[in-house]
Amino acid sequence: MDSFNPTTKTQAALTAALQAASAAGNPEIRPAHLLMALLTQADGIAAPLLEAVGVEPATIRAEAERMLARLPQASGASSQPQLSRESLAAITTAQHLATELDDEYVSTEHLMVGLATGDSDVAKLLTGHGASPQALREAFVKVRGSARVTSPDPEATYQALEKYSTDLTARAREGKLDPVIGRDNEIRRVVQVLSRRTKNNPVLIGEPGVGKTAIVEGLAQRIVAGDVPESLRDKTVIALDLGSMVAGAKYRGEFEERLKAVLDDIKNSAGQIITFIDELHTIVGAGATGEGAMDAGNMIKPMLARGELRLVGATTLDEYRKYIEKDAALERRFQQVFVGEPSVEDTVGILRGLKDRYEVHHGVRITDSALVAAATLSDRYITARFLPDKAIDLVDEAASRLKMEIDSRPVEIDEVERLVRRLEIEEMALAKEEDEASKERLEKLRSELADQKEKLAELTTRWQNEKNAIDVVRELKEQLETLRGESDRAERDGDLAKAAELRYGRIPEVEKKLEAALPQAEARENVMLKEEVGPDDIAEVVSAWTGIPAGRMLEGETAKLLRMEDELGKRVVGQKRAVQAVSDAVRRARAGVADPNRPTGSFMFLGPTGVGKTELAKALADFLFDDKRAMVRIDMSEYGEKHSVARLVGAPPGYIGYDQGGQLTEAVRRRPYTVILFDEIEKAHPDVFDVLLQVLDEGRLTDGQGRTVDFRNTILILTSNLGSGGSEEQVMAAVRSAFKPEFINRLDDVIIFHGLEPGELVQIVDIQLAQLQKRLAQRRLTLEVSLPAKQWLAHRGFDPVYGARPLRRLVQQAIGDQLAKQLLAGQVHDGDTVPVNVSPDGDSLILG
């Protein structure tokens, strides 16, 4: 035993056997201890070796446990258990076998053969079940191939393909892959490249979510169906998992050893295996431990060039440029196959192909109009992602929402249940009372409780019946899908009798049951459970993701939009044309008649200070979002220098703040449906207007990091004081001299706000008083302002130069200041009504 050189796993098995014998109080380490240690090893080779000779490892393990239970125990023995004669013989046999096979280490498979040799109880057990020494030796090739054991951890390289990859063709045979619709040109191009003699390595390049991985799954399905040229017939497509290959590689060289084992297996398959690596850029640098170290990319280069490894890669445009193109030697070994984003029409076709899978998974019905809505709405509103992925996600989430509602108790049942609980508590309280009134009330309450319990039972039964009907349909659909998969498998395997029995017997039978169950599920009246995904459900998900109201307008919202001028007019006085223009823009967008490739509206508001330009933008945000803060306000006076343009869209690469994004672009990316106010636009540097040209015309803007930000659901309002006080012609002349023609030409409308008339001031007084009243509501104070007092405020607060702002200050001074003093002095208390009148001399207002 001087030359005994065990692998890490063999040493671990011997240690585990020693510990097990010691814990059980056995004086000797018997072959049964060694066998149990080998069978219970994580990632051990004993179980696969037994399976390779047709023996069930669980059976052997159960027998070994019974043997261990019968072993003698020595109590009080302090010394460690020693190897028994049979165990020593097994280890010696393993050592001789390793020498015979020219292996440098005694591996666990050598030890398994040693345990099966001789006349020990374990040897009889293994041989009796068919795991004879000769059978186990013949199985070596299946498990470890023709490789010699030259490292202390060879087990990590055994069955490397099974450990570190997924067989896509096997998954396709089992029907576990989603159907691939379209993409014929891309699959044909992949097949052409794979059929080459050398450099037969296509790399699928495209944006995330366009279906690169699906193309490889489509190839696997075609190979299984036999719909490929002779050169690819009966080939196996495996998806390599580099993550699991790197995971747990503790020592330098361990990752390379695993990868080499996988590559050797692929090489030995003589071209039968096509390898797929998703996220191909991960091979660059994978497993490298320092400068100049070998990584996965460098290890596979020679095989790629010689055509020994047929590799299909998939990666995005950015990552291909960043990682693969940098390594020219690696890039030249790949043939690029560009995968573009499918059109909306193609996406609808893809969704129709996937519809059955999602219906079976969620147990709901998905209407065709929902699929069309998913494709169109995702294309229109979810701009940062790509079809068909974003459309599939919409359908999936809408269906999962509906499934969650079906599984939850309906609101009607919840309400009745709470009422029953409340009545039961009342009943218990009244039962303790002795007076006649309480007894009479108790009788009425019991009658009501009985009615409500009956109603609850009826509702629960109805809900349960509806749920059962939906479950029956789902189970039948699952059954049908399983049978169709079995039928396809039987046909491929040439079992025509089974295929005929399924296709003409069991499948029509289940289809008939489904046809009978569907009308029953659909014909219910006053349904409690909705089981159909429609366009409105898709629109709800879009709204939840983006905040954009994409759904059909409800009656309440329609009425609200039709009277939009009245609502905005309550806040902005005397500017009918501006209110009309903004209202028309919002209605066009919500009715779907606006140009989808431009912002909802873009306006320039001109006029003197204090006439309501900024107030209209706030009122619009308040109207649309019920929150006046839901507005991006950019004070253009802060953008007077040339370099400040970078603050709007984000600093370019190489500058400080590059990773932070721009103030305008980031605000719109986070909230794509918003009002953007560019206040005092004339104070900005002229270069800022060049940035806005693209927004006004195309509805998009590229930020400092190269991302396109969508402005198509925003309303842009630019305010300016240019030419204020002049005539309309003078104002427009000032605008034309300050802004370039291409900038003015891209605006929807240039609206001139007129100075306020004295008659309009009373309405503004009402607005200012209403705002003050809202602040006083917390103290339950009510102001009663007389008409003369309002007229006094309007007269004193009017200033044609400064607009309505002096009026706000006057309300604060004449009413707010007096009221504050009276509250502090205790003259006015919470809940009081405070009258406001003009003083006898007409110089001030009197409170109280």
UniProtKB/Swiss-Prot annotation:
Annotated residues for binding of ATP 2: G607, P608, T609, G610, V611, G612, K613, T614
Region of interest called NBD1, as start-end residue ranges on this chain: 159-341
Region: C-terminal, residue numbers: 756-848
Parts forming coiled coils: 392-526
UniProt key word Chaperone: yes
UniProt key word Cytoplasm: yes
Region ranges (Repeat 2): 83-146
One Gene Ontology cellular component annotation held by this UniProt entry: cytoplasm
Stated family: Belongs to the ClpA/ClpB family.
Subunit structure: Homohexamer. The oligomerization is ATP-dependent.
Protein name, as recorded: Chaperone protein ClpB
Organism: Mycolicibacterium paratuberculosis (strain ATCC BAA-968 / K-10) (Mycobacterium paratuberculosis)
Lineage: Bacteria, Bacillati, Actinomycetota, Actinomycetes, Mycobacteriales
